């Protein structure tokens, strides 16, 4: 298992209930270890994932599939 992190910028502010629902959805995706929103900026999401099982691009695709416009932030 190789753990990697990705920072996702979601184009709109995400309310608390929507944050919870998106985090719960992503926790069910094979290879995602820990999705979490920034406490200070509710449009930024950090996702720890097993890069042997999934990729940042696949995570972004899953977020798009939930109806969010988002991009990977290079850090």
Where are these regions (language model features)?
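Short glycine-/aliphatic-rich beta-strand segments at the starts of folded cytosolic domains
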Residues: 1-12
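Short Gly/Ser/Thr- and Asp/Glu-enriched loop/turn motifs at secondary-structure junctions
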Residues: 3, 38-43
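Short acidic amphipathic segments
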Residues: 14, 23-38
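Conserved short beta-strand edge segments in small beta-sheet-based binding/regulatory domains
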Residues: 35, 66-75
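Short amphipathic alpha-helices in soluble, non-transmembrane regions
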Residues: 21-28, 58-66
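A generic structural motif
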Residues: 8, 43-48
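Helix N-cap motif at beta-to-alpha junctions
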Residues: 49-54
């Amino acid at each position: 298992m190789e753990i990697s992190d990705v920072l996702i910028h979601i184009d709109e502010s995400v309310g608390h209930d929507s944050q919870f629902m998106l985090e719960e959805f992503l926790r069910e995706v094979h290879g995602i270890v820990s999705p979490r929103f920034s406490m200070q900026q509710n449009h930024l999401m950090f996702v720890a994932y097993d890069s042997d099982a999934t990729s940042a691009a696949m995570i972004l695709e899953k977020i798009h599939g939930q109806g969010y416009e988002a991009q990977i932030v290079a850090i």
